[in-house]
């Protein structure tokens, strides 16, 4: 028989049988019957031979004739031992087992932890146990998942007996001092005990009474268990209203199914993995009629099935509330006043009657149900004292009465009348953020403070690690999925250019939040009478100035740090920063006035009605709810001034210059690059009216320092008369210029249209680099071309070809009055760059 199981059919083991197995007896039965799964007891054989529609949960193996199985194996392929399915494709067979039989393990690996013995066959493990562990009965099988491989690790219990909640196994007897429990506490009903009194004489007599006999056996076994737990110390603290926690554990396939004694044909096991049903049960275990109607439409299952499923879940988790308790718990839940209970273990024995259980068993609690980690063990020591070892979970063991009562009656000696003694609940931590509405995560809108925390973290890293996510969960009170979704959305928006999160915008958001909650927030350092600004010490002023140099809009953490160091109030710090920004604004305005600019940076509008992105950003920030709007304008004016000054010097900054601008302005590097690109495009259309002013200011600053170098580096100087006349003539009519006049332009040509522009020849090296940078953008000295004035052209010997092409392109642009990119720019750029 063993050779037949070595065919192409993979070895399959049900996980529900891994919990408790008497390995020796089951090995013998496996050899006798020739099945890949060890059977349980005599009653299971009888039920497998005559299956009933109402006992599907109790069926484990379907017995087939030997001839049928042999005929299928002769054809080749794979057959399922739990249903008539067969196929010749291994992938289809594996998919069938995973979908239809989730509790079946394919090709497990058996490991003996005592001897380091490893095998893939159950028969080999049985032979190993009979040879090396003769007479041993306390075997434990532990299920482990390793790299898509299911490992069943066998160990031997070192000592005495362990309290169990399973029905009597094949290897246990009535005189055992205890019943063994496995990795997961299970309640197996629907099985008859393998003694002569319980097994009926005829097969047809067993079918009608199997459920009632099994339930009676459940009650008697519970009485036996609770009688052995008499020495356990009872905890008299009554439990409060605690919501059930029905979250899917990672080992969902290992959780045993609870058989329903009543109406098993109506119980739909497909609802056990329905996320909608589980979420609804997590919210409240007693659904209203409206919720039942909604669940009926959402899950596409009959309402009667949903009612039975909810009743079964309450039965499974030991929940049985009176109507008054249901209303009270519902009010507390929606008022946000549910308090969690400390982890306790409560064993509450009750009076039991050995008679048969009446019909409404769904309204009573199971004898025992363990939630949380499935490694809780109650060990009964032979000395008489009972040691309780468990993980920090809440466990309640309540007796079951069979008088049709809604809640079990508890003896006064056991506990002083607890209101609801049969709740099994894992306490949840209290919510971090108070008054959180009980709405779906997608419907909740984030507050400004939550968005500020998220933006601050987004600036540090667009892909936060787990530690940062947990910190954001504690700070914002948002769920992990909400935080992940927010980061994903903003990464997409930043890549598309929809939003731009900068340090300045974050600082302004935090300032706005601080300003809105000043009147209702209590701080660690209360604000007393404000000091006068003149009374600040030198140390305080130095600390404030250092912070101002870093950022003119301090963050919340920076303000708290300044309060600790300077001993000033929050109002004083905010006022000082506001006054300091106003002082800086006035100085900036004075600089702009000295440059002859009567316009503000945010008011510069292009002739075609277009604004640069940075100007639009500054205009948008004007409308923000900031304490001092003028400070935001001047802050942007300072940034715009630095960018424009750099643009007047060179329109193609180097990477080092981009880094310097990012450090000086506080803007993101990508924003600066985009600003330069847009302004170069505007320069081609002739809409940069501010460029001439900034270039004049830049050249006037360089004029005083470069007079000597200008005289020293001047090689050939044409007279103003000749140079001016030839250049103006060439600008008016290039074709009329003869060869002699064009040769005069080769050594040195200087056109003077404005006496104040003589300083342009002051720094030849820098002027040449500026022209090379300008030629890359194809515009030359465009600010003067808009007014129709050409300041100068400096030419050295050896550049005749390049300069002639450049002069041709310039003359065409001057004549047409527009700024276009000439084809000769690509040729002139290398020549000028090499000369520079």
Curated annotation (Swiss-Prot):
C2H2-type zinc finger locations on the chain: 78-101, 110-133
Region (Disordered) residue spans: 24-58, 168-210, 404-442, 700-836
Region of interest: Required for interaction with NFYA: 263-497
Any one cellular-component term (Gene Ontology): nucleus
SMART domains: HOX, ZnF_C2H2
UniProt-listed SUPFAM superfamilies: beta-beta-alpha zinc fingers (SSF57667), Homeodomain-like (SSF46689)
Region (Required for repressor activity): 263-446
Subcellular location: Nucleus
Functional note: Acts as a transcriptional repressor. Represses the promoter activity of the CDC25C gene stimulated by NFYA. May play a role in retinal development where it regulates the composition of bipolar cell populations, by promoting differentiation of bipolar OFF-type cells. In the brain, may promote maintenance and suppress differentiation of neural progenitor cells in the developing cortex.
Assembly behavior: Homodimer (via homeobox domain 1). Heterodimer with ZHX1 (via homeobox domain 1). Heterodimer with ZHX3 (via homeobox domain 1). Heterodimerization with ZHX1 is not necessary for repressor activity. Interacts (via homeobox domain) with NFYA (via N-terminus). Interacts with EFNB1 intracellular domain peptide; the interaction enhances ZHX2 transcriptional repression activity.
Protein name: Zinc fingers and homeoboxes protein 2
């Amino acid at each position: 028989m063993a050779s037949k199981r070595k065919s192409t059919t993979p070895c399959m083991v049900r996980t529900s049988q891994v919990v408790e197995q008497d390995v020796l007896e089951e090995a013998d039965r496996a050899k006798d019957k020739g099945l890949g799964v060890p059977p349980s007891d005599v009653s299971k054989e009888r039920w497998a031979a005559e299956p009933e529609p109402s006992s599907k949960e109790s069926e484990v193996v379907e017995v087939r004739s030997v001839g049928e199985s042999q005929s299928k194996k002769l054809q080749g392929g794979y057959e399922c031992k739990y249903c008539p399915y067969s196929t010749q494709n291994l992938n289809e067979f594996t998919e069938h087992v995973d979908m239809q039989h989730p509790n079946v393990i394919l090709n497990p690996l058996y490991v003996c932890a005592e001897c380091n013995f490893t095998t893939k066959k159950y028969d080999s493990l049985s032979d190993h146990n009979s040879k090396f562990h003769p007479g041993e009965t306390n075997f434990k099988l532990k299920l482990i998942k390793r790299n898509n491989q299911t490992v069943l690790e066998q160990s031997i219990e070192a000592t005495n007996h362990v309290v169990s909640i399973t029905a009597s196994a094949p290897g246990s007897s009535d005189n055992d001092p205890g019943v063994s429990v496995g990795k997961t506490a299970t309640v197996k009903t629907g099985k008859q005990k393998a003694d002569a009194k319980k097994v009926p004489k005829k097969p047809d007599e067993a079918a009608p009474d199997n459920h009632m006999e099994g339930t009676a056996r459940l009650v008697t076994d519970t009485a036996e268990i609770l009688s052995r737990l008499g020495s356990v110390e009872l905890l008299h603290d009554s439990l409060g209203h605690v919501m059930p926690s029905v979250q899917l554990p990672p080992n969902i396939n290992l959780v045993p199914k609870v058989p329903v004694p009543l109406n098993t044909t109506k119980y739909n096991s497909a609802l056990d993995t329905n996320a909608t049903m589980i979420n609804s049960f997590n919210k409240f275990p007693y659904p209203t009629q409206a919720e039942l109607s909604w669940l009926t439409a959402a899950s596409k299952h009959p309402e009667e099935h949903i009612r039975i499923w909810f009743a079964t879940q309450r039965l499974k988790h030991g929940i049985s509330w009176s109507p008054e308790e249901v209303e009270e718990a519902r009010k507390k839940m929606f008022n946000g006043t549910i308090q969690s209970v400390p982890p306790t273990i409560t064993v509450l024995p009750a009076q039991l009657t050995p008679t048969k259980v009446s019909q409404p068993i769904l309204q009573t609690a199971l004898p025992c149900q363990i939630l949380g980690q499935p490694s809780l063990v109650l060990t009964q020591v032979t000395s008489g004292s009972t040691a309780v070892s468990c993980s920090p979970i809440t466990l309640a063991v309540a007796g079951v009465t069979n008088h049709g009562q809604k809640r079990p009656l508890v003896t006064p000696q056991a506990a002083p009348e607890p209101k609801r003694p049969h709740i099994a609940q894992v306490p949840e931590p209290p919510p971090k953020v108070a008054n959180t509405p009980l709405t779906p995560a997608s419907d909740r809108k984030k507050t400004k403070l939550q968005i500020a925390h998220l933006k601050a973290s987004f600036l540090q890293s667009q892909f936060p690690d787990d530690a940062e996510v947990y910190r954001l969960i504690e700070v914002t009170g948002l769920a992990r999925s909400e935080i992940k979704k927010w980061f994903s959305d903003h990464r997409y928006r930043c890549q598309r250019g929809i939003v731009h999160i900068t340090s300045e915008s974050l600082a302004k958001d935090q300032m706005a939040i601080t300003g809105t909650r000043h009147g209702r927030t209590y701080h660690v350092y209360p604000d007393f009478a404000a000091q006068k600004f003149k009374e600040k010490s030198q140390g305080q002023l130095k600390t404030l100035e250092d912070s101002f140099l870093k950022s003119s809009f301090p963050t919340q953490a920076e303000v708290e740090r300044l309060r600790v160091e300077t001993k000033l109030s929050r109002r004083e710090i905010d006022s000082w920063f506001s006054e300091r920004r106003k002082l800086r604004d006035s100085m900036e305005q004075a600089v702009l006035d000295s440059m002859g600019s009567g316009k503000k940076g945010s008011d510069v509008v292009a002739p075609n009605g277009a604004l640069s992105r940075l100007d639009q950003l500054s205009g948008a920030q004007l409308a923000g709810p900031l304490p001092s709007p003028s400070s935001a304008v001047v802050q942007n004016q300072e940034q715009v001034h630095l960018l424009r000054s750099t643009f007047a010097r060179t329109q193609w900054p180097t990477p080092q210059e981009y880094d310097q601008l990012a450090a000086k302005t506080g803007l993101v590097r990508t924003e600066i690059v985009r600003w330069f690109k847009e302004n170069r495009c505007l320069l081609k259309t002739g809409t940069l009216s501010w460029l001439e002013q900034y270039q004049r200011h830049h050249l006037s600053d360089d004029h005083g320092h470069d007079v000597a170098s200008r005289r020293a580096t001047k090689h050939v100087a044409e007279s103003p008369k000749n140079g001016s006349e030839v250049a103006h003539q060439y600008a008016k009519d290039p074709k009329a210029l003869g060869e002699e006049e064009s040769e005069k332009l080769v050594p040195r040509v200087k056109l003077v249209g404005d006496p104040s522009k003589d300083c342009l020849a002051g720094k030849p090296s820098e002027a040449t680099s500026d022209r090379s940078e300008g030629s890359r953008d194809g515009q030359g000295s465009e600010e003067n071309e808009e007014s129709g004035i050409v300041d100068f052209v400096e030419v050295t010997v050896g550049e005749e070809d390049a300069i002639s092409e450049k002069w041709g392109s310039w003359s065409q642009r001057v004549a047409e009055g527009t700024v276009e990119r000439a084809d000769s720019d690509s040729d002139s750029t290398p020549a000028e760059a090499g000369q520079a």
